[in-house]
């Protein structure tokens, strides 16, 4: 709502004052506190507020900018009209056919009637822009009239904040509906080019058109849903024109608005400021904006109502022409940077797990939000959504671009930066340790050791386990030293096809494979690698595939009646449990009979990741742990992948029903935002390092151990997972929550070109039936490229394709993505 003098009339209060509960005082501001309301609806509402929407597509043929204000009544509409006025003049002068229109969109407007045409208080913003932005000089200069397309998408009569107007008037609009209206409007406004015009158009140059989307109030003013509009519009991430505050106190509000936008990942193309009372607020803002490369444009104060603004606009035409040129230069530079990355990325990067000689098309990721990347498409000159089907290498836990997470990280960076950890304590690390021990470590762990990533977490775990084994068995550590001619050998009991990371120690806990045989001359497999029984959907039913080495003379198992039956504890008394026990015991005993010590057991519980996405029969792993425990062999759970709701439960321990001695967590630990890992251990394990000699301490460490930003990210992520868990309705129907449509995967498993499928928690897996299966297989490469062209950023493990979401993703979204996946796969098969 436009108020010329940028002052507010005093209105009587619309509500009586109410007493709100006072939250407990906190001396830190990381993490989230669950709602104190006990109703399920309140819990669900808080859960819904955690999630970020996906990405909305829009064309880059015509530059589009979003106008935010550092407050209400500071001249957003006045500035918008000036920019549109300048753009119409430029468009008329150049007579561009394909540059697109000049347009102004007001998504939400209060203080007008529902049609947006009759103002209750003052003039509607769209009407104001339409009046002052038209080309009044066309008759004298003989230029073609270039109109401004002005529209209001949703409005209320009451001149208050949208959330309050919606409440008072009894009609509202959801954020999803608002974004859909806006995206559709932007699509309609884009120029409809002929093939000839598309060929002639320079995608790296801004046309003469320009579209402005003006927000309501300040940067964090709410939409009708009470969510900050800076969060709601983040799904588009349009570059911003920030209108600063020229009044007394406006320096602070302008700076705060700028920081609120930056922390949410917006690009600020320009700041416009209507100065008041000759305060020169721009001069105070300029040192910071200059550092950020953001130009500031200033205008003189506007005359008071009811004096018209025609002369004011004429006096400022040159300023607005500069603003418009700057915005178009920003747009052009953005497109040129996309092109530069597309051309040069492969020449400067060395991508992991990539054969550069066969690298495919580079995806230019402009940003990410929710479960999707915002990717630049040079062929259509658009930014479009691409579902992050690999959860950015299995890390995504709270959605990309989550503003609550961004705020927590900024707070920790501002309060601490990085501080030394040994013999020190800081709030983020202390709070995180308490949360870890009260959740995944509850009942068994007492110590938390921090490191950098999953691989190093497992390295630490192996050092812990071997020390525990050596002392428990009253051995001398020196007998395992590499400089001893007759040194004893100590190895790890692990699973065939396992993968625990890329550092040398954990590389050695893996069989010879494509992951290690040409990677390091010091690689030596130091383990007993047990083949594991695998669970999958085949021909529509859950089957357990048991290698003959395990099964012996045991008859083939009948298909299980349901997925939940896989985790039924009554299977512990089945004949199959005895078969598993005999196999594990024989593997350990036969190894130790040769004089080799089995000093630790290391397993990926339930789901093995990089080795091929295999669901391991939990009965087998439970038996393995029991056999190791009977022999005082420390057991490590590598939950780097499986931990923190990846499998639909907090920890794979919840599905196995048996505790480890040591466990490793990463990836989802920090919500997928920053790298960090934690290795949890029991007090018995800790005590094996508790001695008088420094040399007997755990001499392992990283420069950024327990860095505050990482700990703050983890605390925030764990709080979000807790809120998610609180909002769920307990059910006895399913032991494991699955986000993906099992019926679709069961049907897929009946196809002749599919070897197996399954889904557990946030993971869905489809293995193609091929002759040369394995990680080195290229059979899925064509399908991967087809999926990426059709909105799904998938990766594969050889012939095994998978999709992964975050714990905050809705099942409806998963169904949408899975449908797209299956459709593209079936179309490709039909062509063969």
Language-model segments: residues:
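Hydrophobic anchor at the beta1->P-loop junction of P-loop NTPases
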Residues: 67-68
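N-terminal phosphate/diphosphate-binding loop that engages ATP/GTP or pyrophosphate donors
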Residues: 58-64, 78-177, 188, 192
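Phosphate-binding/switch loop-helix module in NTP-utilizing enzymes
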Residues: 162-223, 577, 581
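N-terminal mitochondrial targeting presequence
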Residues: 1-60
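Conserved N-terminal phosphate-binding loop of PLP-dependent enzymes in the Aspartate aminotransferase
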Residues: 332-832
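C-terminal lobe/tail of nucleotide-utilizing enzymes
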Residues: 33, 46-50, 258-336
